[in-house]
Amino acid sequence: GLACACALAAGGAWGAPERPKKDVEVVAVYYPHWHKYPKGTEWFGAKWDAGEWDFVKTARALFPGHKQPLRPYPGYLDGADPKDMETEIALAANAGIDVFLWDYYWYGGKVTQEESIEKAFLKARNRGRMKFALMWCYHERNNQFRPHLEPSRQALMTLDHTPEEFLGLIDHSIARYFNQPEYWRKDGKLFF
C-alpha cells in the first residue's frame, strides 16, 4: 500500500538524509490493515491470514490491459511488525511525507484494528522521523471486498455509539496517543 507509492517517489533511496524543514507538511492517510487481525479472520475465514494483502494477491483483471495482481515494492510488508514499519517510515520520510494520518476505528466502546499503530509504529526504532495523528473513521465498517460488483454491502461493524462510548474514545486517545512526542500538532494544537 503506502510503502509502494513512497518507494517509487523516493526512487528507492532508503538511506537518504533527513529532509530540511519546510513550510508545507505532507500528510498520508494510513490504512492500518495490512496484517492479520482477529476481526478479519472472523469476517473472512481462517485462510485470510495476511490482512488486506490477501485481496491484493487474489486480484483479477477486469478488462483487457488491466494488469492484476500486482506485487508491491518492497514486498508484502506486515503492518503489525515493527521492522516492516521501520521500512515504511524510512520510505515515506525519504519521499517527503511528514505525517501518517491513521484510520482509527472505535466500535462498541473500544478501539479495534489497532495492531499496526500499537504493535508496529509505537515500537519502530525510527518513529521519530514520522509524526502521526488519528482520524476517527466514523462510519459503518462494510464489506467492501465482494467477489462481484453488486451494490449490497454487508455491515461488519455498525455505528451505535453512546455519548459515554464517545467519551471513552477521547479518554483512550488522550491516555495512549496524544501524549506521544510524535503526535502531530498544528499551531501547537493536537490534530484529531
Model-derived regions: residue spans:
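Boundary at the C-terminal end of the N-terminal hydrophobic targeting segment
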Residues: 9-15
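Bacterial N-terminal signal peptides
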Residues: 1-9
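Glycan-processing catalytic domains of CAZymes
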Residues: 17-192
